[in-house]
């Protein structure tokens, strides 16, 4: 069949050329219109359920809200893990499904389960809401709003009602979360002493205010042949008119709201969170995109919308988009990988020209590159995959191998044409016949060598989870581009050879061999003769090097993925629970000042607390700081160490330092935004926190551990209002009345909405701050008895101070506390091994408590096992492919002896660079084994041809065959190796982090 393909191509040369040009044009067009992203879709199918629970304490939220939701979804079809966090007034449940679950099916399953929960939740709890469908790479843009004279109330209103709707209307946006500033609301602030004076009960106030600002309908009337809609218009946004609403009549005189309360416009209380930019109060707007939406294109649309909005904003309002912009990381990453790809191509050109010394042969070989790459892009596009650093990385790693097939074909055609030209004129064959026979001669080695490399990449496709999502596109891009290069070598390359190499040349035939090729053959022949004369020395030295390399391999550290350089730090600063938002804000400002003192950091933005229905449920004691940076002379690690040093002066604060995407990957893997998570499960939070600190103390001096923290799940101050039931009975006060009194006076109740020029604001009733600002004032609040008399709350209830949990985190319906850590200066697996040893030796857990470990190392161990097993299988398949070609087990085994030689160089490359074996490095070894067998295949195949067709002996065929194939082997090896140099040397640049370990391993292995 391959002969037919070559023959058809040579007989239809114009058709092949036109088809190739059309393919190149179509692929280029597709490349410019394919979605570009930094990584493939890494998100595990996860559905987030969020529930606002008023002012409930964390323990009540856990029992009354979180537990019913967890129970409903736990055990549902496809669910692998359920995590939850219950904080004051808020519940968030993460329902994680198996990786192969369709996200729309997952959301449907959760929605059906939630339908059974609603009736079981308390009346004052909001409806469980599904979070928007997004991903860990979905956070697109953080927009900062600051102002000089505009109030924070007006600034927040602008964000909520002008900017947010405009951004949400942009196609592809999933969510726009606003944090900071003051949320506007209309307030009716009750004064108990005035209510007592006028004899107004709370029930009367609530009866009047509930729905007081809602219009009513009066049906229709017909008059003069017209139909008139009758409306009762009571809705108003005028505070004075609201204040004049009558509550009751006393002795014929009306008592209005303004008589018993302050009616005003104010800021929502309590505040859930606040924000700042460069230490200045701000409003931060976080934009999240929908899945399968182009990041760069959507960012451009959003920035255009913001620029348009800026024209109509107050002059003092500043809009900044440089806080976090994911497209900046994408552009930098893609640009770096593309640069490495281009530079690799230049190295390939240099190698080809040096060895071929002929412009035409170089051009023919290079044509393979663009065609193979555009075919890969077309296949990725029609598979629904994006262009990202992984797919481009696959092409960059393959770029040296893409010209291999063409090199072998062109070199063989060139040699046969030269030999044909040397024949007498009457004995010369037609050019097309020479090209056909020369191409046919190497067709099977070309195809088999390609299949071998493809088989070596098969283990990639057995990876599951996040690592599979990340690395499979790299394998697809590599394999598709490699197959495309083989097809080009069988079709277009012979056609171009017939056109460019088949013309009239000088009498002495085609140009002579290049000087480099002649020089290499001369010296190689000497070395080969010496090696054949000293077989034992060569074998002994090789075995010794292999043993040393094997021993060195087992001393290398192990990690999951290399650290990324995202150009931004994400820093969590957490204080003790129970601290006020104002005090937490002060600590956050100190952290901002310290960060801005670092030269590389030009701006910072901080979120303290959370926004409404925000799945990143941070307490008011936690600040999250985004700190973008630009490296200028110092390395990423040096800047990171200075950040750690600067922030270490914040006494009483726990510091966690990550990067925007990296810490979201960590959170997806273990539920914790750190490399390592020690999960302690139990029932008693105080005991768990004590054990957590014991674990922290036990592992604190482990070499390489950094950012060691215990989750701040500890008790915070509470005020409990506990009814004296016998006194309630004495005064005829029901529990329902008592609960309403506490809720309305303390937390407040939203009784209606106020509509103001297309905007909607809450109308809230609660006690004035002066009457509820301390324990003594709460005791003096007046509750109505059955006769409408005012009774001090202290008569019927105890008001006492106590302690209660601030946050309760759970996993699979079990309370947990996490001791988290990152690594610095040491490999992940060694740090984890030391941690596990310390914990096992020093920690005695009570009955009912247990520890689980989570984080990147789990994925690293699982992926390493998978790759090891599947690599052994791929080696067996490679042996079978070799055996099918040669029908000789010993020859197939000899070719596989290249693998130990390749291992030697790969191991020493790691020893001299990172000193760690990561998943990308393992993949580098796997691909190296496939590439290494290619050269052996070409040699053995040519040895057999010389022995079978020309009757040479073994030694003579080895000498002649090795010299004949030296050029193509050196060209393929050098082009493959040198093309990887840019990736190997620039591993610290954004986008190159994952491909760099692969490139180093392959480069080192090819050299040996």
Regions found by a protein language model. Name each.
Residues 330, 334, 410, 415-448, ...:
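Helix-loop junctions and hydrophobic alpha-helical segments within the transmembrane domains
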Residues 26-32, 37, 318-319, 346-415, ...:
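Hydrophobic transmembrane alpha-helices and their membrane-interface caps
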Residues 36-46, 83-89, 124-148, 177-183, ...:
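Flexible hinge/switch segments at interdomain interfaces of large molecular machines
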Residues 2-36, 440-442, 510-562, 602, ...:
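Signature of alpha-helical transmembrane segments and their immediate interfacial
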Residues 1-17, 415-437, 466, 472, ...:
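Interfacial helix-loop-helix hairpins and adjacent transmembrane helices
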Residues 60-132, 193-214, 235, 582-672, ...:
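Solvent-exposed, membrane-proximal periplasmic/extracellular interface segments of envelope transport
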Residues 14, 21-57, 115-124, 381, ...:
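Transmembrane helices with small-residue packing motifs
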Residues 8, 39, 50, 118, ...:
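Extracytoplasmic/periplasmic membrane-proximal domains and adjacent transmembrane bundles
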